[in-house]
C-alpha cells in the first residue's frame, strides 16, 4: 500500500500546499516538510511563512527551511528522515545529486505542463501565450537536469478561449494531486512505467518579466489577446499613457483588416477601445489605470476620453 511509504514533501506556494493537503487527506505518511525560509511581505515587510509551512505546522509535521541544500549538514536533514520518496512541488531550491539519490525511490516532481513541452519556470503562462489547445501536469522522476527526468504519469486538460494563467493554475492544482496520488501508488506497487522524454519535442518556458508584458502593437491581435490572458494575474499586460502604466485585464480580437499603423486608435465607444495591431484589431475591454481599480473601457472613457482619441497612436 502506498500509505506505508515514508514521504518527504518539499514545496513552497499555495500550488504546493494543495498537493500536501491531498497527501495528508488521503492518509499518506509524510515524515517531514521542506519549504523556503520565511520572506518579508506586505507594506510592513513582516516575515511571512509559506503556505506549505502554515499547513505543515497546522498538521503538526516537522518543518525544515534551509536556504540551500548544498551544505552537508542540510543534506543530512534529508538523510535522517529515511524517506522512501521525496515529493517536490514548486519548492524553489535546486536539489543536488546527493539529495536526489537519498530516498529509496528517488525524488518525484509535479510539473505544470505536458512534458517535454514547456520545461522550465513558467509552463502555465507559456502554454497560453503560445495558443496551445491543451496542457496538463506531468509527474516525473527527478534527475540533475531542468525537468529532464523520465515521465511517470500525465493528466491533460483543455485550454479554453477564456482561460487566464489564474484559472489554468486552479485547474492544474486540482489535477496535480490526482496524478501524484496515483503515481505514489504505482511506485509503491512496483507498477510505475517510466517514459523517456522525446528530445525532439522539447520547448522551454522562459521566466516572465514586466517588460515582456508591455503591449507591443506590432504583434498580431490574436497574439496580444493571448498575452493578456497569459500574463494575468502576473505580471499583467500594460501600456503607457502620459507616462502612466495602464494594465489591460481583458481584450478581444476583431477580425477586420486595417491599413492603420500598429497602435493607432480606431474607435473608442461603449463596445471597447479598438486599436490597430500588426495583424488585425485588438478591442480593449477592461483596463486599470495606476492607483485605480480595474474598470470597463466605457467607464475609463467616461473619465479619460482624451487618452483614446481616434487617430492617435498608443506607444
From Swiss-Prot:
Organism of provenance: Shigella boydii serotype 18 (strain CDC 3083-94 / BS512)
UniProt entry tagged with the keyword Disulfide bond: no
Substrates-to-products reaction catalysed: L-methionyl-tRNA(fMet) + (6R)-10-formyltetrahydrofolate = N-formyl-L-methionyl-tRNA(fMet) + (6S)-5,6,7,8-tetrahydrofolate + H(+)
EC number assigned by the record: 2.1.2.9
GO terms under cellular component: cytosol
Enzyme class: transferase
PANTHER family in alphabetical order: METHIONYL-TRNA FORMYLTRANSFERASE, METHIONYL-TRNA FORMYLTRANSFERASE, MITOCHONDRIAL
GO molecular function, one term: methionyl-tRNA formyltransferase activity
Disulfide bridges in this chain: none
Protein name: Methionyl-tRNA formyltransferase
InterPro entries from the UniProt entry: Fmt, Formyl_trans_C, Formyl_trans_C_sf, Formyl_transf_N, Formyl_transf_N_sf, Formyl_transferase-like_C_sf, GART_AS, Met-tRNA-FMT_C
Chain residues that bind (6S)-5,6,7,8-tetrahydrofolate: 113-116
Keywords, sorted A to Z: Protein biosynthesis, Transferase
Classification of source organism: Bacteria, Pseudomonadati, Pseudomonadota, Gammaproteobacteria, Enterobacterales
HAMAP family (UniProt xref): Formyl_trans
Similarity comment: family membership: Belongs to the Fmt family.
Purpose of the protein: Attaches a formyl group to the free amino group of methionyl-tRNA(fMet). The formyl group appears to play a dual role in the initiator identity of N-formylmethionyl-tRNA by promoting its recognition by IF2 and preventing the misappropriation of this tRNA by the elongation apparatus.
